Curated annotation (Swiss-Prot):
It is found in: Mitochondrion. The expression of ai2a in E.coli causes growth inhibition and degradation of genomic DNA. The lineage of its organism: Eukaryota, Amoebozoa, Evosea, Eumycetozoa, Dictyostelia. Keywords: Endonuclease, Hydrolase, Intron homing, Mitochondrion, Nuclease. It comes from Dictyostelium discoideum. GO terms for molecular function: DNA endonuclease activity. This is Intron-encoded DNA endonuclease ai2a.
């Protein structure tokens, strides 16, 4: 009996930890891409606007809180929850985790409306899943083959937002904005050193991202540094370019195929359910991966022929 009790206690602890991580991730996602509103008739709403390729995030939210998913533009989808049961559940999940100054004002108003005590968030650290949700919403990792440099990018209207949200303090570094064309369409690039990148890599392995392309890029970070070290010893520019080109295809594979905005947009016009659209998305990804695999096989055959010659 004691063994069974211990197992049950362990399961409960694991469930509590995983639910806490998920709540922190959700708060980060809302801070980056969400908005709380209170209508004149006294109904609370939460809207979260993401790119079409991140529809799986919305489906996960719909399964937990109800609500609806609608296409906003060609490449954007909106999740909305407004029913009382879903809103109350959501308040319980994110209370004590909301950090964005505007979201805090909106969320306080919602809490007051439903007579819920508002909780202030704790200091942001690497032992918190908030950053993964915020990164899913507005974060990017870019790289420059010319400088062999990785950049952290955020879609911010204000360059001071990293300080306001304590992200710099959490990372333990002072991020400096790139001067030459650093802001383009409200995307700001920040130079990051290898130590910070690898600590982010470890963090995102513990607090996983839900965005497919960002997850792919995070997993490719060690390979980036492998190629960086390899190209230092190579003098032939053509060989260097070839290595970076192959890596570039892996890094931006979803962008190059462009199945998200074009093919999935057509499915939104029909009355198919979100679950069916995700199945179609998986099929499209499978065909994409097959093309990549066949391309890799052709490259290997070419290399073998070159060696024999």
């Amino acid at each position: 009996m004691k063994k069974e009790e211990k197992k049950e206690n362990k399961k409960r602890e694991q469930n509590q930890i995983s639910s806490k991580k998920w709540n922190e991730w959700l708060a980060g996602l809302i801070d980056g891409a969400g908005k709380f509103t209170l209508s004149k008739s006294g109904y609370a709403n939460l809207d979260i606007l993401l790119e079409l390729r991140d529809e799986k995030c919305h489906i996960e939210l719909k399964q937990r809180f109800g609500g609806e998913i609608k296409r906003k533009e060609t490449t954007l989808i909106r999740y909305r929850v407004h029913r009382l049961y879903g809103i109350r559940q959501l308040i319980a999940c994110v209370n004590g985790h909301i950090r964005h100054p505007l979201r805090k004002i909106e969320f306080k108003e919602i809490c007051m409306h439903y007579n819920v005590e508002y909780k202030e968030p704790e200091t942001l650290t690497f032992a918190n899943g908030w950053l993964s949700g915020y990164f899913d919403a507005v974060g990017l990792i870019e790289f420059s083959t010319e400088q062999d440099q990785l950049y952290l990018a955020f879609r911010h209207k204000k360059n001071t937002m990293l300080n306001e949200l304590e992200i710099q303090k959490c990372l333990g570094v002072n991020l400096t904005c790139e001067q030459n064309g650093c802001s383009c369409e409200s995307v700001t690039l920040y130079k990051i050193n290898k130590k910070t990148v690898l600590s982010l890599y470890k963090y995102f392995k513990k607090y996983r991202l839900r965005s497919s392309i960002k997850t792919t890029q995070i997993l490719l970070i060690p390979q980036f540094y492998e190629i960086q070290n390899e190209t230092k010893e190579i003098n032939d520019m053509q060989v260097k370019q070839k290595l970076w080109k192959q890596f570039f295809k892996k890094w931006y594979v979803d962008e190059m195929v462009k199945y998200e905005s074009v093919k999935l947009a057509n499915y939104y016009k029909s009355k198919t359910s979100p679950e069916k659209r995700v199945k179609k998305l998986i099929k499209l990804k499978f065909h994409r991966n097959e093309r990549i695999r066949k391309r890799a096989e052709r490259l290997e055959l070419q290399k073998e022929k070159e060696k024999k010659a």
